[in-house]
Regions:
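N-terminal leader/signal peptides at the extreme start of proteins
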Residues: 1-12
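Conserved beta-strand->loop/alpha-helix structural units within folded catalytic cores of enzymes
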Residues: 29, 51-57
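Aliphatic-rich helix starts adjacent to a transmembrane/signal segment
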Residues: 36-51
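Alpha-helical hydrophobic helix detector
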Residues: 18-34
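Conserved catalytic core of two-component sensor histidine kinases
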Residues: 21, 48, 55
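Extracellular/periplasmic head regions of type IV pilus-like filament subunits
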Residues: 56-59, 63-136
Length: 136
């Protein structure tokens, strides 16, 4: 008489593996768009902070050199009041997305959000987000 082996082989069935893959795909479909949105929002926050730093640097330059409203401050003058080694200091008056802040800034006038940056981040940062800075 032939005996069947009673030992059962361990492992996962194809159906079990497919269910796990489907669950992982579902979680990824939910998480990835949220991650990308959060990343863009953090980029917008970084640009906003750079605008604040530029405005403060222009004000500091104007105070130390007795400049009045409307005086045009050059990037090299602003740069002296930024933290040495920072990305903004090392840039050629550009934000992290490559948008140009401009080479000159006017005393007592807030700097503007670069047009290309405003356009690329408009889905996560509407006009109110950029207040009080000028938008295109």
């Amino acid at each position: 008489m032939i005996q069947k082996s009673q030992t059962r082989r361990g492992g996962f069935t194809l159906v079990e593996i497919m269910i796990v893959v489907a669950i992982i795909a579902l979680l990824a479909a939910i998480a990835v768009p949220n991650f990308l949105r959060a990343r863009k929002r953090s980029q917008a926050t970084r640009v906003l902070e750079d605008l604040r730093l530029i405005d403060a640097a222009v004000d500091q330059y104007a105070i130390e050199t007795n400049r009045t409203t409307g005086y045009q401050v050059q990037w090299d003058d602003v740069k002296r009041y930024l933290k040495v080694g920072s990305k903004l200091y090392n840039s050629t008056h550009a934000d992290i997305l490559g948008g140009d802040f401009g080479a000159t800034f006017s005393v007592d006038t807030l700097p503007a959000v670069p047009t290309s940056t405003y356009t690329s981040l408009s889905d996560v940062a509407p006009a109110e987000f950029w207040s009080p800075f000028r938008t295109p």
